[in-house]
Amino acid sequence: MTRDSFLNDPVNSYLIYIPGKNTDVMIGVPHHAPLGVQHLPCESHPTSDENTGFIGYRLAQMLDCPCLIAGNYFIDPNKYKSSDYFKKIEAIGPRFLIEIHGHAGRSAHFDIEISAGSLDKSVLSENLANQLSSAFSVHPSLRNYTISGDFFQIHFRATKSLTINTDQWTAFHIELPQKLRENPDQYILLCESLEKIIRAL
């Protein structure tokens, strides 16, 4: 199967690893499903993050860095150190992990929420959020999205994610709204903005 065939597969569970030269950075996507597939075969994480695999892969292409995508997955892979997802990230050993997630808008306090997993690291997520907000301000299609990395203010704090809460690498958990995830023009601009920010880390 081709990469796009995997990412568009609405049924089969898979973990796909796409290598890249810049191993200082790694992109992770633990809950991908194609657009229109809202559910995962996972009791502890039944809601999918639609289309996040395509976004993560596009960002990894721009950065020429490794990308790891779990699609239609039967476990919640970023919550267990024993998962093949966690072990692959550990084997690569990046300095920075960028995890792409999606939300439906019902619980989020902001359109885009960024967490580094704990209050102690809030300064990192706030800095990334501020830079992304500044980048979005020059694009008419993006400037109205609200963005926060303030641990006190956001809903999706990623406190239970073991890929985020670790000292093995610096990690950012990025929650994206459905509207942005389903619009290629918008998510390509997002990826271009993130590429510039991440290269300067």
Stretches found by the model and what they are:
Residues 1-201:
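N-terminal catalytic or cofactor-binding beta/alpha core of small enzyme domains
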